[in-house]
Amino acid sequence: MPHAETPPSAYRTPDGAAFAEKPEHMTHLRGNILVPKTHPRIAFRGGIDTLEAELLLCAQAADGPLRQTLCAMLDFVRSLIRADVLDEPVQTVRFLGLDGDGLREHSHHPEREEGQPHFLPAPEDPPILLRLNRLRTAVRQTELLACHAFSRPDGTLARPDIVKALNRLSSLCWILMIRVKRGGQV
C-alpha cells in the first residue's frame, strides 16, 4: 500500500512546531512564523493599534500645527510596527524641532524650557488638553507592553530603540499639553 504524503507545513512556530493551516488562536509574528495571540509581541502590536486609534481621535479634535504634529506622530507610531516586524532600526525621533534628548529635556524642565510649571490636568482644562493627556497614557501603556515584549532574561532589551522612541513620544505629549496649558503656539 503506497504511503500517503504529508502535506507541506505552511506555518511554523519559533520552537519548530509545524502547521499546514493557521490555527485561529495563533497569528503571524513575522513571515510564516506563528505565535499564540497572547504572545507579548502581539500584545505590544495591539497596544500600537490602540495608540493609533487614540492618535486619530486626538488629531481629529485638533487643528493647525497641533494637528500636523499629531499626524506626524501617527506616521512615526506606524513606523514602529514596521521596525518590529521587519527588524529594522527605528527612525530618528524629531518633533517640534527637537530631537529625542531635547524632547526629554523640555518635558522634564517645563518651566525653564517652556515657561510653564509642572501641573496636573484638571476637569477645567480645555478638552484638547485632556485628550492629549489620554493620548499620553496610551503611549505609556504601549511603552510598558514594549518593555514586556522585548525584555530578555538577563534584564536587557532586544529592542531598546522601540522602548526609547515610545518614551520620547510620552515626553512629546507632555510638551504638547504644556503648550496648550500656557496658551502658546504648539
What are these regions (language model features)?
Residues 1-186:
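Phosphate/pyrophosphate-binding loop motifs in nucleotide- or prenyl diphosphate-using proteins
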